[in-house]
């Protein structure tokens, strides 16, 4: 059993080399691992037979398609709500504001999880509720980190309707807010979905480094004071990064 475990460890060490180089020859694998050529040849032959490695016409090895299959299975089975909830609960305890998780659904955002703080205010947001991508910090944290051409196409085809007194309805101003969000790594909104409320949102990225969701804190506008904003923004950004890493972002 111990010898089998050693073989597994050595095989993993060999496979890890392909994280840094797309293809490697047998000689390169021997040089990088420091293992005997016969041992390396035996391992790569077994890994190739099982589909973990593939070999091209020149004899160089690369990761096999089985990794793509496994990777897709892992991605499909990740429940972002389940992963995010403990982080959201901790964030709520720290800032004592409502914490929300939002995901994109076409040209809208849908609230998929929410943790209430101790404040008596009950906001516009609720699980299952929708908002346009341009309005509110949480939704805009998703819009801001989409590919630029997709953002511009969205703004061009979307009528920016006022929802609250602070909703951004000017396309140029919206683009400016998006640029600021990208630069800062977070989005702030005041009275965009509901008057006298404020929110700070940050993007959550997946294993493909694409925006997968957004997390925000929201509450009374009066509680989002200028001197408190730096603390709140760092907390939201940190929570977003924690969740991103848990779903494969590197």
Curated annotation (Swiss-Prot):
GO terms for biological process: negative regulation of DNA-templated transcription. Gene3D superfamilies: 3.30.450.40, Winged helix-like DNA-binding domain superfamily/Winged helix DNA-binding domain (1.10.10.10). PROSITE patterns: HTH_ICLR, ICLR_ED. Keywords: DNA-binding, Repressor, Transcription, Transcription regulation. InterPro entries: GAF-like_dom_sf (IPR029016), HTH_MetabolicPath_Reg (IPR050707), Tscrpt_reg_IclR_C (IPR014757), Tscrpt_reg_IclR_N (IPR005471), WH-like_DNA-bd_sf (IPR036388), WH_DNA-bd_sf (IPR036390). Transcriptional repressor of the kip gene-containing operon. This is HTH-type transcriptional regulator KipR. It comes from Bacillus subtilis (strain 168). The gene is kipR.
């Amino acid at each position: 059993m111990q010898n089998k475990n050693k073989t597994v460890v050595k095989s993993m060490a060999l496979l890890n080399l392909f994280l840094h180089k797309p293809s490697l020859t047998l000689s390169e694998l021997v040089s990088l691992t420091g293992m005997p050529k016969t041992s390396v040849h035996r391992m790569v032959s077994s890994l190739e037979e099982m589909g973990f490695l593939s070999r091209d016409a020149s004899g160089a090895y690369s990761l096999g398609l089985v990794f793509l299959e496994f990777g897709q299975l892992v991605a499909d089975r990740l429940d972002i709500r389940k992963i995010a909830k403990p982080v959201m609960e901790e964030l709520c305890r720290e800032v004592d504001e409502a914490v929300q998780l939002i995901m994109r659904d076409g040209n809208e955002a849908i609230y998929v999880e929410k943790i209430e703080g101790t404040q008596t205010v009950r906001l516009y947001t609720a699980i299952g509720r929708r908002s346009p991508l341009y309005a509110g910090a949480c939704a805009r944290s998703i819009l801001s980190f989409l590919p630029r051409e997709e953002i511009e196409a969205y703004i061009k085809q979307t009528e920016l309707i006022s929802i609250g007194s602070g909703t951004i309805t000017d396309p140029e101003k919206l683009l400016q807010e998006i640029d600021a969000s990208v630069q800062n790594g977070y989005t702030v909104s005041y009275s965009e979905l509901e008057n006298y409320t404020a929110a700070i949102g940050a993007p959550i990225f997946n294993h493909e480094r694409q925006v997968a969701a957004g997390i925000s804190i929201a509450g009374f506008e009066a509680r989002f004071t200028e001197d408190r904003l730096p603390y709140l923004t760092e907390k939201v950004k940190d929570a977003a990064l924690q969740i991103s890493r848990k779903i494969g972002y590197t």
